[in-house]
From Swiss-Prot:
EC number: 2.1.1.225
Ranges in a coiled coil: 113-140
GO biological process assignments: tRNA methylation
Function of the protein: tRNA methylase which 2'-O-methylates cytidine(4) in tRNA(Pro) and tRNA(Gly)(GCC), and adenosine(4) in tRNA(His).
Gene Ontology MF terms in the entry: tRNA 2'-O-methyltransferase activity; tRNA methyltransferase activity; zinc ion binding
Protein name: tRNA:m(4)X modification enzyme TRM13 homolog
Length: 481
């Protein structure tokens, strides 16, 4: 598959001081610097006869790279994959739901393995539970002047334009809710490259005391938050799973008491539930009167319960202004309901009140993908689309960019012959609506006024529902910040 520099398949020679190993897949030589007197880098040393005396093994921390066996101990001390000390804002499972093993079935078969009778019974339960719900949401498709130039830039391809339209609408909805202003902290969950915060910052121009916290659990390339060097706004990126994020422990929120605006574009499945719990339970509840029950009655390990109790006590160490809302608002574009998890779902109480439980939730979340899998591309269309994206270097390709089409992640959820495409789409939308309704009730119980609306055209994205929430009886953030 790969040969050295002497291979007839290797055109030319490696650059001076660079590895002589020819990478067949990339049609070029390895570009790693070699040690003095060596032909190959450490990773490809096995290809050189003179290196045979030293054995290379897979790194036990990350098998994607190798290391000399006789230098393993030294390597483990500096390997980038070694476990790093946990930051103060990391508290294990602080935003996790209750693990009730009695409710989780031992084995759940794929939808395709259900009998026609079992499937009909599930759909009947779904329709009964959805009675009275308004399946047609209001259109709140908006835009914002901050993105005007980008939206009209011919250099942006179709993919980039679709993302810009969504970001413009989310930004317009944030402004419409009067959440766009100075003296606050925007927490972007599932931030990715950080482009939503980027546009919020541009829209705010020179607003004072604006802080951005970008939460993402994986390392991300081509981040845009590093481009912001303004004095009036600060960007801080946290690489952490939302499940373990304690906002109360972040210095700027602990010291300055800035109202938080939770935002997100296409926050996948259970990440939405974790973000809601992070905002309205772990964070907002710590500012409530201490004679109320601290946070939620969730069974956790002793360490976590102790941390929560400490946070509740620390919440009023500084005088908090009267009528001040720790969470000024929530604006999250929903996505990927098929990735929800019963343990973390915030609407369990709503489901139970309808006579539903973990089994029904499991199948409803699987069937929710039917709402976005009806408009499948042909192989030719998909191939052409892929080629087009590769040719256009300006396209803003991101995780949910599929040109408005969605493909289910589990072929076992398909039921050819039993239901038509339109029937499946309607059932999928009902599943999404029911899951979202549980989130709505949860926010209402926590003292918020939530709403669901369409924020973009389905031709732009089939995941086009926006969840917004404002605290009840809240005064304008401009006057309370």
């Amino acid at each position: 598959m790969a040969t050295s520099a002497t291979s007839p398949h290797a055109p030319g020679f490696p650059a001076e001081g660079r590895c002589g190993y020819y990478v067949e897949k990339k049609k070029r030589f390895c570009r790693m610097v070699v040690a003095a007197g060596k032909r190959f880098c450490g990773e490809h040393a096995g290809a050189a006869e003179e290196e045979d005396a030293r054995k290379r093994i897979l790194c036990p921390l990350d098998p994607k790279h190798t290391v000399y066996e006789d230098q393993l101990a030294k390597h483990l001390k500096k390997c980038n994959s070694r476990e790093k000390p946990k930051p103060d804002f990391y508290i294990q499972d602080i935003n996790a739901g209750l693990r009730d093993e009695t409710e989780i079935p031992e084995q759940l078969v794929p939808i395709s393995s259900l009998s026609e009778e079992q499937l009909e019974k599930l759909i009947k339960k779904l329709r009964k539970a959805s009675e009275g719900l308004n399946s047609t949401l209001k259109d709140h498709i908006m835009s914002h002047p901050a993105l005007h130039d980008a939206l009209n830039d011919p250099k942006n391809g179709d993919s980039a334009t679709k993302h810009l339209k969504q970001q413009a609408s989310i930004l317009g909805n944030i402004e419409n809710l009067k959440l766009l202003g100075p003296r606050r902290c925007f927490v972007e969950f599932g931030a990715g490259k950080g482009k939503l915060s980027h546009w919020v910052d541009i829209a705010l121009k020179d607003a004072e005391k604006v802080h951005f916290i970008l939460v993402e659990k994986v390392t991300t390339r081509f981040k845009v938050d590093g481009k912001h060097r303004k004095k009036n706004s600060v960007f801080e990126r946290l690489q952490i799973d939302i499940q373990h994020l304690c906002l109360n422990k972040i210095p700027v929120l602990r010291e300055e008491k800035l109202p938080v605006v939770g935002i997100g574009k296409h926050l996948c499945g259970m990440a939405t539930d974790l973000a809601l719990r992070c905002l309205v339970e772990t964070y907002a509840a710590s500012f409530e009167e201490r004679n109320e029950e601290p946070l939620a009655k969730r069974i956790k390990n002793d360490k976590t319960e102790k941390e929560i109790y400490t946070l509740a006590k620390e919440g009023n160490e500084k005088n908090v202004p009267e009528k001040w809302n720790p969470v000024a608002g929530i604006v999250i574009a929903l996505c990927c309901h098929h990735r929800c998890d019963w343990r973390h779902y915030v609407g369990k109480e709503y489901f139970r009140a309808l006579g539903l439980g973990a089994v029904e939730f499991h199948y409803f979340q699987r069937m929710s993908s039917w709402a976005t899998c009806g408009m499948r591309k042909t192989s030719l269309e998909t191939s052409n689309s892929t080629t087009k994206r590769q040719d256009n270097q300006n396209d803003d390709s991101e995780e949910h960019d599929d040109g408005g089409y969605r493909i289910t992640d589990d072929g076992a959820d398909c039921l050819p012959g039993l239901l038509s495409v339109e029937e499946k789409k309607k059932i999928g939308h009902l599943c999404k609506l029911l899951i979202d309704q549980g989130r709505i009730q949860y926010l209402q119980q926590k003292g918020f006024s939530p709403a669901l609306q369409y924020y973009t055209d389905p031709l732009v994205s089939l995941e086009n529902v926006l969840l917004t929430a404002l605290p009840n009886h809240s005064s304008s953030p401009e006057t309370t910040a």
